[in-house]
């Protein structure tokens, strides 16, 4: 009997009380909840980006922290620690020192957790886009949060396609600034909804 209670408690880590039958999220339910929360966060960020051309720091930082907690829960400790390390490396001067530290940390992150080496390389690539001024800080934080939260780098493919379409439309309209969170939301929405179709 004690083994069943312990097993029930171990399975029911979501914080619900153990009564007769514990209510625990299965993998499918957890996946749906995570995707819903992700899409709501991205939608709110998109509204701010369209309205003010700026996403508030608490939204992006909250998303990044939430993704880190979820990543640790799923065993993606190396990408989470790499993200934390890259936020600290961003303050180093000169740029050569930042880049050397970032590359070294990413290599070690990939070595220590080979299953997550691709995610670490993607996180480094996204950070480099910010480092060279190609992308804004809010966009980078959201992309890293999405990559860790989903745990699959292929989510960036529909985001890149949506960004390309948005870029073509912006160039036809002679726009200089593009609210990229729109592409992030549309790509993530497609990635989440496509398997359900």
Spans of features found by a protein language model:
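A membrane-topology feature that recognizes alpha-helical transmembrane segments
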Residues: 1-197
């Amino acid at each position: 009997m004690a083994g069943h209670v312990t097993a029930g408690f171990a399975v029911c880590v979501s914080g619900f009380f153990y009564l007769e039958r514990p209510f625990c999220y299965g993998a499918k339910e957890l996946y749906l909840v995570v995707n819903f929360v992700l899409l709501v966060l991205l939608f709110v960020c998109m509204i701010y980006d369209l309205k003010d051309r700026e996403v508030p720091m608490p939204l992006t930082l909250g998303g990044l922290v939430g993704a880190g907690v979820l990543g640790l829960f799923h065993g993606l400790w190396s990408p989470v620690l790499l993200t934390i390390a890259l936020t600290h490396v961003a303050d180093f001067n000169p740029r050569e020192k930042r880049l050397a530290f970032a590359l070294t940390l990413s290599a070690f992150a990939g070595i220590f957790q080979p299953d997550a080496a691709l995610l670490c390389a993607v996180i480094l690539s996204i950070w480099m886009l910010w480092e060279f001024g190609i992308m804004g800080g809010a966009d980078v934080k959201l992309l890293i949060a999405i990559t860790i939260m989903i745990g699959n780098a292929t989510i960036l493919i529909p985001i890149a396609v949506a960004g390309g379409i948005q870029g073509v439309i912006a160039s036809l309209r002679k726009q200089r600034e593009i609210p990229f969170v729109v592409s992030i939301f549309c790509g993530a929405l497609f990635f989440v909804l496509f398997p359900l179709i």
